[in-house]
Swiss-Prot record:
Site for Activates thiol group during catalysis, residues: H177
GO molecular function list: glyceraldehyde-3-phosphate dehydrogenase (NAD+) (phosphorylating) activity; NAD binding; NADP binding
A Pfam cross-reference name: Gp_dh_N
Protein name: Glyceraldehyde-3-phosphate dehydrogenase
Function statement: Catalyzes the oxidative phosphorylation of glyceraldehyde 3-phosphate (G3P) to 1,3-bisphosphoglycerate (BPG) using the cofactor NAD. The first reaction step involves the formation of a hemiacetal intermediate between G3P and a cysteine residue, and this hemiacetal intermediate is then oxidized to a thioester, with concomitant reduction of NAD to NADH. The reduced NADH is then exchanged with the second NAD, and the thioester is attacked by a nucleophilic inorganic phosphate to produce BPG.
Catalysis performed (reactions): D-glyceraldehyde 3-phosphate + phosphate + NAD(+) = (2R)-3-phospho-glyceroyl phosphate + NADH + H(+)
Organism listed in the record: Shimwellia blattae (strain ATCC 29907 / DSM 4481 / JCM 1650 / NBRC 105725 / CDC 9005-74) (Escherichia blattae)
Coiled-coil boundaries: none
Gene name linked to the record: gapA
Active site annotation, chain numbering: C150 (nucleophile)
Pathway: Carbohydrate degradation; glycolysis; pyruvate from D-glyceraldehyde 3-phosphate: step 1/5
Subcellular location(s) per record: Cytoplasm
Class in the EC hierarchy, top level: oxidoreductase
The keyword Nucleotide-binding is annotated on this UniProt entry: yes
Family: Belongs to the glyceraldehyde-3-phosphate dehydrogenase family.
Length: 331
């Protein structure tokens, strides 16, 4: 049975979710809402500076998209309550505008005829967050959920493997994060975050992130044990988590590597990857795993204090997991 999905917001994540859906037989995108006109949406879908050309045909007919021969309804509504998702057969909405991240605002999609909503960013209220490889099994039928953030999707599986095998006393995370759309090409106004307003291509910019604390929401046993920060760096895509951990149970770095490798081949296959190659960030462009453990990059001071490194394509990996969550809540 194919799940019919609508996308609200055709920005970076909306478009990569769309591309990822073309690789699946269980999910079909039937409607897109964005304030862009259809011709421009088609152009943005066809050509991507980071991920290359769209693998398929994209046309516009009567104001709607025709992708690989299938019509996709296009609308330009500001208020989600007016979207009439039911008329397009939409069952689940991928809420990708970044604007409707509370139960109250996202519920407008339900009012408009959808059955369920997946937010493609961390919720700003108590809406539950689900991360594949961490807490999918706790889903209890909620109609509005969040896929958390790309960084939480990298960190949570890594932290879970460490905690399940060795226990985490406390940990600090740094994500070295690629540039995103909220940053400035040259210095510009950013009243809430002065550093964030500095030119993205010229600077390494320290920034805050709620990703580590969010792990405490998806893995309650780690609540209060993790916090973190970010450095925004002048690369277009692919980020890396540096997790410094004090272990409850002593373990050699070799033992940690074995645990990661076993998880990547077992319960976390498709979520957690493992590599012993001499990799750099561009090697992970297009990576669908949300966390790839870099065995060669990590270090240990002793058997209780270690630094672990894990890579993620902050666009592709995350977008694939949005679809995994849509499929999971539709069972």
């Amino acid at each position: 049975m194919t799940i019919k999905v609508g996308i609200n917001g055709f920005g970076r994540i909306g478009r990569i979710v769309f591309r990822a859906a073309q690789e699946r037989s269980d999910i079909e995108i039937v409607a897109i809402n964005d304030l862009l006109d259809a011709e421009y949406m088609a152009y943005m879908l066809k050509y991507d500076s980071t991920h290359g050309r769209f693998n398929g045909t994209v046309e516009v007919k009567d104001g709607h998209l025709i992708v690989n021969g299938k019509k996709i309804r296009v609308t330009a509504e500001r208020d989600p309550a007016n979207l009439k998702w039911n008329e397009a057969g939409v069952e689940v909405v991928a809420e990708a505008t970044g604007l409707f991240l509370t139960d109250e605002t996202a519920r407008k999609h339900i009012t408009a005829g959808a059955k369920k909503v997946v937010m493609t960013g961390p919720s700003k209220d108590s809406t539950p967050m689900f991360v594949r490889g961490a807490n999918f099994d706790t889903y209890a039928g909620q109609d509005i959920v969040s896929n958390a953030s790309c960084t939480t999707n990298c960190l949570a599986p890594l932290a879970k493997v460490v905690n399940d095998n060795f226990g985490i006393v406390e940990a600090l995370m740094t994500t070295v994060h690629a540039t995103t759309a909220t940053q400035k090409t040259v210095d510009g106004p950013s009243h809430k975050d002065w550093r964030g307003g500095r030119g993205a291509s010229q600077n390494i910019i320290p920034s805050s992130t709620g990703a580590a604390k969010a792990v405490g929401k998806v893995l309650p046993e780690l609540n209060g044990k993790l916090t973190g920060m970010a450095f925004r760096v002048p690369t277009p895509n692919v980020s890396v988590v540096d997790l410094t951990v004090r272990l409850a149970k002593p373990a050699t770095y070799e033992e940690i590597k074995k645990a990661m490798k076993a998880a990547s081949e077992g319960a976390m296959k498709g979520v957690l990857g493992y590599t012993e190659d001499d990799v750099v960030s561009t090697d992970f462009n297009g990576e669908t795993c949300t966390s790839v453990f870099d065995a060669k990059a990590g270090i240990a001071l002793n058997d209780n204090f270690v630094k672990l490194v894990s890579w993620y394509d902050n666009e592709t990996g995350y977008s694939h997991k949005v679809l995994d969550l849509i499929a999971h809540i539709s069972k």
